[in-house]
């Protein structure tokens, strides 16, 4: 059986969850349509998602059509959940991008399409809600061409009046874009030679799967218009990006979820091989796990299975698998499936409204951070405050609501702050010798540090010979330094520097790698005290798309948010502004843009790097480490 995995993406309220229900219903997977309003849909099944009318976590369901099984990934549709979007995109064979016929291309539509293009996902545009009053499809087509891509193929003719009718084009009017994009076909067409339908279809298929051509279909998910045709398109146009024939097992964990009974589930996309119940499987070329229970989605329901084939999405109950873990042969994982998660740029202090719920809060955060790599937390060693790092305002609102709904814990939030970095100010060296108090470890370590230009990152090298200090000791020093770099003099991550391991001494047989691992961060702290450090704050590069009439307002507001606009373009009655802005200002600038453009602006951002800050340094308390904190304190007293 052919197995394909598709994503359904859209801006808020475009109807993606309703479309998922219609696909399930028309294919026979379910016998009754669920309702978004009543909260009976197969996806968006948490109270929070139903209340907000948005998808927050990736939902998975499926249907079967003839000899094809289709797994549907109902992805989030908000800026703060793009990490969840990217994780779900990584397992897709294709995507359906919904566009409301009434609303046209919205800001979130553009952001999602940008993600699809970046990931190289073949995409179909589905214009939904064509049965609403006042629809002008020609305006929607123009909107798509100007804001998404001009390389579209209108696959259907839509008659709205007097009776709605959607029919597939069969003549040459749909092929203009296909012909124009191929020099050989264009030359043949211009010379008057006939073009065979087969060669046009082949060219369309090639460009569709290369993400350089996007077919457009129409319908109404709510009133079951165009859904049967869309099912045919899905099962015929998309194909699975899996290894055919016998091969080694390869699968990737793309989602971790906890059930109401606190069972930990790992969602895995299989790219090759067969996974059997009771198999012992190697994970990320390290440890092995045993498959004791295995589930998959069958016609909208989770069912136990005893084997799963390449292309399938399976769910394992497992305590050890992590997000992005690879089962089996890592070399067989498709290259485009590897993606870096963005770094959280903000942090906030939280506390339970009821002090007696502190342990419940910590347990809940442990589960939430396990399933969301963009949420991290630690407990301050001095104040015992709980500090979260996160991406955006809505993400924090959702976490607060999730804690209340699922874990029955209410929290109070302080003002968020940006996450800084540190860089050494000058070159410095420091050595701690073995058997010289207060050093309690059987190790000597000498380090040097020197600042590097912005954008260089942290570089490490060892000038100590492996012939003298073997690899296990050298690795321990490097691990200790990486740990020490997590907290500089002001408590922030140390970067933009070169650290050199210059001197090492051990006593055989009493010295162990642990001695070097624990001493290294203490030496690093002392050498940083000699060098001094400066704070760096994160800067984002941005690209703003806004209606042309808002150009002057966007320019005038830029200095207020410390934004520097470096390039301006005018295109299709739209202004495109490029520049950079401190991360601490982006939330307000984006909110302001959305407000004064009435939601018609788009602001895409990426981390550009770090700039030196001015003013008083912002300090962050150190995280505790019971094994070395006492020694740190003793060295700090004598230095």
UniProtKB/Swiss-Prot annotation:
<keyword id="KW-0046">Antibiotic resistance</keyword>
<dbReference type="GO" id="GO:0046677">
    <property type="term" value="P:response to antibiotic"/>
</dbReference>
<feature type="binding site">
    <location>
        <begin position="128"/>
        <end position="131"/>
    </location>
    <ligand>
        <name>GTP</name>
    </ligand>
</feature>
<dbReference type="InterPro" id="IPR041095">
    <property type="entry name" value="EFG_II"/>
</dbReference>
<feature type="domain" description="tr-type G">
    <location>
        <begin position="1"/>
        <end position="242"/>
    </location>
</feature>
<keyword id="KW-0342">GTP-binding</keyword>
<dbReference type="GO" id="GO:0006412">
    <property type="term" value="P:translation"/>
</dbReference>
<keyword id="KW-0648">Protein biosynthesis</keyword>
<dbReference type="InterPro" id="IPR020568">
    <property type="entry name" value="Ribosomal_Su5_D2-typ_SF"/>
</dbReference>
<dbReference type="InterPro" id="IPR031157">
    <property type="entry name" value="G_TR_CS"/>
</dbReference>
<dbReference type="InterPro" id="IPR014721">
    <property type="entry name" value="Ribsml_uS5_D2-typ_fold_subgr"/>
</dbReference>
<dbReference type="InterPro" id="IPR035650">
    <property type="entry name" value="Tet_C"/>
</dbReference>
<dbReference type="InterPro" id="IPR000795">
    <property type="entry name" value="T_Tr_GTP-bd_dom"/>
</dbReference>
<dbReference type="InterPro" id="IPR005225">
    <property type="entry name" value="Small_GTP-bd"/>
</dbReference>
<dbReference type="Pfam" id="PF00679">
    <property type="entry name" value="EFG_C"/>
</dbReference>
<dbReference type="InterPro" id="IPR035647">
    <property type="entry name" value="EFG_III/V"/>
</dbReference>
<dbReference type="Pfam" id="PF03764">
    <property type="entry name" value="EFG_IV"/>
</dbReference>
<dbReference type="GO" id="GO:0003924">
    <property type="term" value="F:GTPase activity"/>
</dbReference>
<dbReference type="Pfam" id="PF00009">
    <property type="entry name" value="GTP_EFTU"/>
</dbReference>
<comment type="function">
    <text>Abolishes the inhibitory effect of tetracyclin on protein synthesis by a non-covalent modification of the ribosomes.</text>
</comment>
<dbReference type="InterPro" id="IPR053905">
    <property type="entry name" value="EF-G-like_DII"/>
</dbReference>
<feature type="binding site">
    <location>
        <begin position="74"/>
        <end position="78"/>
    </location>
    <ligand>
        <name>GTP</name>
    </ligand>
</feature>
<dbReference type="InterPro" id="IPR000640">
    <property type="entry name" value="EFG_V-like"/>
</dbReference>
<keyword id="KW-0547">Nucleotide-binding</keyword>
<dbReference type="InterPro" id="IPR005517">
    <property type="entry name" value="Transl_elong_EFG/EF2_IV"/>
</dbReference>
<dbReference type="InterPro" id="IPR027417">
    <property type="entry name" value="P-loop_NTPase"/>
</dbReference>
<dbReference type="GO" id="GO:0005525">
    <property type="term" value="F:GTP binding"/>
</dbReference>
<dbReference type="Pfam" id="PF22042">
    <property type="entry name" value="EF-G_D2"/>
</dbReference>
<dbReference type="GO" id="GO:0032790">
    <property type="term" value="P:ribosome disassembly"/>
</dbReference>
<dbReference type="Pfam" id="PF14492">
    <property type="entry name" value="EFG_III"/>
</dbReference>
<protein>
    <recommendedName>
        <fullName>Tetracycline resistance protein TetM</fullName>
    </recommendedName>
</protein>
<comment type="similarity">
    <text>Belongs to the TRAFAC class translation factor GTPase superfamily. Classic translation factor GTPase family. TetM/TetO subfamily.</text>
</comment>
<dbReference type="InterPro" id="IPR009000">
    <property type="entry name" value="Transl_B-barrel_sf"/>
</dbReference>
<feature type="binding site">
    <location>
        <begin position="10"/>
        <end position="17"/>
    </location>
    <ligand>
        <name>GTP</name>
    </ligand>
</feature>
């Amino acid at each position: 059986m052919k197995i394909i995995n598709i994503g359904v993406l859209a801006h808020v309220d475009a109807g993606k969850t309703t479309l998922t229900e219609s696909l399930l219903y028309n294919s026979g997977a379910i016998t009754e349509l669920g309702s978004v309003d009543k909260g009976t849909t197969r996806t968006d099944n948490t109270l929070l998602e139903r209340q907000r009318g948005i998808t927050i976590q990736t939902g998975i369901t499926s249907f079967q059509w003839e000899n094809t099984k289709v797994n549907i990934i109902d992805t989030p549709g908000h800026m703060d959940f793009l990490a969840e979007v990217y994780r779900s995109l990584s397992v897709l064979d294709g995507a359906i991008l919904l566009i409301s016929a009434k609303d046209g291309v919205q800001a979130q539509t553009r952001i999602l399409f940008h993600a699809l293009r970046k990931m190289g996902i073949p995409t179909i545009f589905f214009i939904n809600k064509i049965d609403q009053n006042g629809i002008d499809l020609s305006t929607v087509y123009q909107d798509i061409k100007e804001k998404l891509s001009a390389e579209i193929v209108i696959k259907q003719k839509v008659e709205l009046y007097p009776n709605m009718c959607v029919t597939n084009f069969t003549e040459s009017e749909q092929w203009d874009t296909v012909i124009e994009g191929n020099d050989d076909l264009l030359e043949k067409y211009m010379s008057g030679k006939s073009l065979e339908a087969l060669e046009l279809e082949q060219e369309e298929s090639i460009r569709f799967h290369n993400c350089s051509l996007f077919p457009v279909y129409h319908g109404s998910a709510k009133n079951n218009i165009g859904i049967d045709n869309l099912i045919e398109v899905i099962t015929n146009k998309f194909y699975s990006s899996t290894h055919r024939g016998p091969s080694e097992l390869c699968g990737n964990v793309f989602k971790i979820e906890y059930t109401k009974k606190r069972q930990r589930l790992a969602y895995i996309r299989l790219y090759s091989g067969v996974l059997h119940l009771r198999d012992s499987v190697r994970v990320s070329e390290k440890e092995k796990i045993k498959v004791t229970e295995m589930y998959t989605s069958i016609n909208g329901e989770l069912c136990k299975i005893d084997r799963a084939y390449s292309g399938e999405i399976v769910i394992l109950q497992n305590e050890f698998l992590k997000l992005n873990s690879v089962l089996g042969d890592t070399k067989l994982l498709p290259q485009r499936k590897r993606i870096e998660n963005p770094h959280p740029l903000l942090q906030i202090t939280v506390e339970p409204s009821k002090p007696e719920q502190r342990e419940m809060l910590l347990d809940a955060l442990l589960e939430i951070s396990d399933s969301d790599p963009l949420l991290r937390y630690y407990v301050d060693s001095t104040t015992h405050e709980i500090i979260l790092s996160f991406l955006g305002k809505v993400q924090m609102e959702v976490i607060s609501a999730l804690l209340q709904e699922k874990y029955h814990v209410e929290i109070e939030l302080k003002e968020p702050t940006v996450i800084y970095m540190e860089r050494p100010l000058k070159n410095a060296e420091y050595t701690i010798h073995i058997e010289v108090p207060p050093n309690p470890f059987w190790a000597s370590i000498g380090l040097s540090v020197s600042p590097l230009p912005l954008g260089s990152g942290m570089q490490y090298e060892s000038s100590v010979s492996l012939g003298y200090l073997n690899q296990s000791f050298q690795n321990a020093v490097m691990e200790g330094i990486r740990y020490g770099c997590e907290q500089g003099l002001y408590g922030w991550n140390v970067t933009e520097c070169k650290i050199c391991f210059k001197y090492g001494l051990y006593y055989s047989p009493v010295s162990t790698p642990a001695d070097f691992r624990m001493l290294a961060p203490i030496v690093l702290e002392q050498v940083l005290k000699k060098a001094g450090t400066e704070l760096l704050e994160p800067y984002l590069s941005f690209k703003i798309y806004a209606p042309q009439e808002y150009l002057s307002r966007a320019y005038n507001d830029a200095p207020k948010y410390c934004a520097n606009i470096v390039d301006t373009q005018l295109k299709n009655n739209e202004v495109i502004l490029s520049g950079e802005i401190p991360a601490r200002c982006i939330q307000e600038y984006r909110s302001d843009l959305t407000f004064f453009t009435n939601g018609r602006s788009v602001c895409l951002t990426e981390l550009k790097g770090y700039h030196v800050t001015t003013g008083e340094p912002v300090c962050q308390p150190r995280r505790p480490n019971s094994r070395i904190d006492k020694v740190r304190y003793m060295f700090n007293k004598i230095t």
